[in-house]
Amino acid sequence: MLILVTNDDGINAPGIKALSRSLARVGRVAVVAPEKERSAIGHGITMHKPLRATEVTWEGPVEMALAVNGTPADCVKLALDALLDEEPSLVVSGINMGANLGTDVLYSGTVSGALEGCINGRPSLAVSLAGEGGVDFSFAADFTSRLAGVIIKRGLPAGTLLNLNIPCLPPGEIKGLAITRLGRRRYCNTITRRLDPRGRAYYWLAGEVEDLDQEPDTDIGALGQGRISITPLHLDLTNYSYQQELAAYLSFLWPGQGNR
């Protein structure tokens, strides 16, 4: 079986290297990842310039290791449609340096890599380790490979992917595993305005995270309690509970139509 691996930290990031080594115990691995960091790129795809896939040297057993001058979604799309000779049994995106929790999933290139696999009908998994700089990816990689084996055997529902967040703790201090829902967080942005040497304004985007929903059943809450969080996500973003109410108060826009 073949496992496609990508990320948003770039092909030289330590997380993807640890992940590919561990997944090689489960199946054959193909690495197709951005040539440079593309964090917070969301689900952007490249439509206005050529994409190039360049072979790179890789430590460990892989079918291929290619760096792409595009986004994580580009990498998965390109791999599935042009680069691979067979369909992968699983798409894994990660291991990201830093958690992807709550509304982070809407910005995350890591999650979008897995999302692109899901759009194309492949079981898919996004993996993030809640740490910064110099962290040890070995436990996260080992846990991901065990989870990958289960997913390959059991599959996932159509249109569903998993978002995995692992605490940056020694394995003995992790409190267990939680199946969670998305929490809610926002970034209280501080925009810094500066001037370049020519006197033209430019801006830096920064800010602090504010967790608005961190109940114990959320991914944010679970990680805060030292537990591994697995959140099933699906492609359908429809708010079904609001459809009838919306139809009722917008019916005047097209009288007599109703909610067909």
UniProtKB/Swiss-Prot annotation:
Principal localisation: cytoplasm
InterPro entries, per database record: SurE, SurE-like_Pase/nucleotidase, SurE-like_sf
Note on cofactor: Binds 1 divalent metal cation per subunit.
List of residues binding a divalent metal cation: D8, D9, S39, N96
GO cellular component terms listed in the entry, alphabetical order: cytoplasm
Keywords: Cytoplasm, Hydrolase, Metal-binding, Nucleotide-binding
Reactions that this protein is recorded to catalyse: a ribonucleoside 5'-phosphate + H2O = a ribonucleoside + phosphate
Required co-factors: a divalent metal cation
Pfam families noted in UniProt: SurE (PF01975)
Superkingdom classification of source: Bacteria
UniProt subcellular location: Cytoplasm
Record EC number: 3.1.3.5
GO molecular function, one term: nucleotide binding
NCBIfam families: PRK00346.1-4, PRK00346.2-2, surE
Summary of the function given for this chain in its UniProt record: Nucleotidase that shows phosphatase activity on nucleoside 5'-monophosphates.
Name used for this protein in its record: 5'-nucleotidase SurE
Source organism (scientific name): Moorella thermoacetica (strain ATCC 39073 / JCM 9320)
Lineage, top ranks: Bacteria, Bacillati, Bacillota, Clostridia, Moorellales
The encoding gene: surE
